[in-house]
Swiss-Prot record:
The keyword Ribosomal protein applies. NCBIfam families: PRK04333.1 (NF003320). It comes from Methanopyrus kandleri (strain AV19 / DSM 6324 / JCM 9639 / NBRC 100938). This is Large ribosomal subunit protein eL14. InterPro entries: KOW (IPR005824), Rib_uL2_dom2 (IPR014722), Ribosomal_eL14 (IPR039660), Ribosomal_eL14_arc (IPR023651), Ribosomal_eL14_KOW (IPR041985), Translation_prot_SH3-like_sf (IPR008991). One of its GO terms (molecular function) is RNA binding. GO terms for biological process: ribosomal large subunit biogenesis; translation. Belongs to the eukaryotic ribosomal protein eL14 family.
């Protein structure tokens, strides 16, 4: 069973120009859309609304508040030791 999409969940974008890049869910809009961020200076994914069908959740999750700023997300990634994973960028598809 895949990990649930929730605030703080690290996901991989599966569609669009940012496909294959890691992002973090910072807010839930409704049952179909969430707000994600890279943050942009880490992964290149800017803060935007995204359809959950275009996200693949990973088992990793960071402890952030709903609506957290990019700086707070980056700080949480550093504390969790996941900043290097996020900077790797594009996930190889198979």
């Amino acid at each position: 069973m895949p990990a649930p999409i929730e605030v703080g969940r690290i996901c991989v974008k599966t569609a669009g120009r940012e496909a294959g890049k890691y992002c973090v869910v910072v807010d839930i809009v409704d049952e179909n859309f969430v707000i994600i961020t890279g943050p942009k200076d880490v992964t290149g994914v800017k803060r935007r609304r995204c359809n959950i069908k275009h996200l693949e959740p990973t088992p990793e999750k960071v402890d952030i508040d709903r609506g957290a700023s990019d700086e707070e997300v980056k700080e949480a990634l550093e504390e969790a030791g996941l900043l290097d994973l996020m900077k790797e960028g594009i996930v190889s598809g198979s």
